């Protein structure tokens, strides 16, 4: 069944195809570079709409499998990056042609026809703006952490895919801990009974509470694109750029048609350069945002340092390492972290609950926490290896380095960090007991 998003894309695709053929034909007939530039922008819109249609289709119809364990949730992100790259390439080609026209201006034949086509193109783009206007503005995300406020998510599968589950796994075991079992007293909360269970808590409704933590109540105002599609936002930028380009075409055609200045033909390449700037100013931020997601950068709305400090303040946690936070899509955040614990395994349950609570408070509802239990006699050694502790002050580990960053043996050594492997050889971090020395084993 065709969704509302697909119907809008198909409608705009049909309209753009008609006007692309019209603009490129009239543009070459009248030698109007502005109209030709706008027609190629329209062609890129057609390509981007095809990519958007494909992205929506695969995101809706292709679920996770053995080959793609996350499914095709990033299909629209990839489509947005392709759109942006095409636009940036188009900018350079138009700019070169416009500079040539500034050196050797060409006479624009039949500017009145160019004007009519520009007006018709503007009307078509106004229709496109009405189709996609919901995707053009950043939404403010404000909520109390007892619940998540429902937003208007245009893609049905995205609201279904927004879920909450955290895994706390013991070394040698890929087993999830049931949060309810952790919080419940008595025998059901014992580690031997909850480790065999693998429970994923999914949100059936976005307005349901994520986790009961009444002691933490504050609001966020951030430009979090959680309720809109990055690729659909890219389509909106295409349409907006086209509309502004049509206004430039109309202005240049009127100026050439109604004036007799000898330099009036310079208005055509000048308008073309303005169109190029408009396209580039929308394409570059889009490419950066899509690239950050595909490169698994830390989301701009999340402070990894703050999360780390809060986790280090949890009782029993002495150090953290291999901490990663990234976007799966614009609205789904994922995190993984290794936590070194100085308590017994059966006491880890309360710490795991607090750690998951911290992730929930920061909007991360899919997290993997791997505990590493250490005995008391090596706690002090571990503390010396980490320079970041709760509160953000440097630990005693810095005493092992001189002012030049050398160790007591005179060798250069990188200060430990929570965001990478704790050993210089980057050994396997799945399980220290197996003594894996493969450098790329993560």
Swiss-Prot record:
GO terms for molecular function: zinc ion transmembrane transporter activity. InterPro entries: Cation_efflux, Cation_efflux_CTD_sf, Cation_efflux_TMD_sf. It catalyses: Zn(2+)(in) = Zn(2+)(out). GO terms for biological process: intracellular zinc ion homeostasis; response to cadmium ion; zinc ion transmembrane transport. Pfam families: Cation_efflux. Disruption phenotype: Reduces zinc transport into the vacuole and hence limits the over-accumulation of zinc caused by the deletion of ZRT3. Residues 149-170 have a biased composition (Polar residues). The modification Phosphoserine is found at residues 387, 393, 397. Keywords: Cadmium, Cadmium resistance, Ion transport, Isopeptide bond, Membrane, Phosphoprotein, Repeat, Transmembrane, Transmembrane helix, Transport, Ubl conjugation, Vacuole, Zinc, Zinc transport. A motif (Histidine repeat 2) lies at residues 163-167. Residues 212-224 have a biased composition (Basic and acidic residues). It is a multi-pass membrane protein. Residues 1-8, 54-75, 134-235, 287-442 are cytoplasmic. The keyword Transmembrane applies. Its main location: membrane. Induction: Expression is induced in zinc-limited conditions by the zinc-responsive transcription factor ZAP1. Residues 141-170, 208-227, 391-419 are annotated as: Disordered. A motif (Histidine repeat 3) lies at residues 216-220. A motif (Histidine repeat 1) lies at residues 141-145. It is found in: Vacuole membrane. Belongs to the cation diffusion facilitator (CDF) transporter (TC 2.A.4) family. SLC30A subfamily. NCBIfam families: CDF. This is Vacuolar zinc transporter ZRC1. It comes from Saccharomyces cerevisiae (strain ATCC 204508 / S288c) (Baker's yeast).
